[in-house]
A protein has these predicted regions:
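A cross-family phosphate/adenosyl-ligand binding-site feature
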Residues: 1-110
Length: 110
């Protein structure tokens, strides 16, 4: 069984994150743990693009980008899948250059 992290950044495309979360929830027999981390900008873009705060409707564990106590912030957390959807160019650039300044980039680094 899988332990999955979904990271949602402030890039345009919140509908993709919403659809992914719906699909993952529907396939919950395929994973043991599903965690979500959203940036502040992701929440604003979601509200703008989708006109709601429906991320609150998903029965999963949410983390803030400053919560470095999240289990997936460490390699010993044994998460096997991380999906960044949508991924902003800023986040992608920080990951590519090894700059870990928040929970998303830290989790991608481990």
């Amino acid at each position: 069984m899988r332990k999955i992290v979904v990271a949602i950044t402030g890039a345009s495309g919140s509908i993709y994150a919403e659809n992914l979360l719906k699909k993952l929830i529907a396939a919950k027999e395929q994973w043991d743990e599903l965690s979500v981390v959203m940036t502040t900008n992701a929440r604003e873009v979601w509200k703008t693009e989708l006109g709601n705060e429906s991320w609150n409707d998903f029965a999963v564990k949410f983390y803030t980008t400053t919560d470095f106590s999240a289990p997936f912030a460490s390699g010993s957390g044994l998460y096997d899948t991380m999906i960044i959807i949508p991924c902003s160019m800023g986040t992608l650039g920080r990951i590519a250059t090894g700059v870990s300044n928040d929970l998303i980039t830290r989790a991608a680094d481990v």
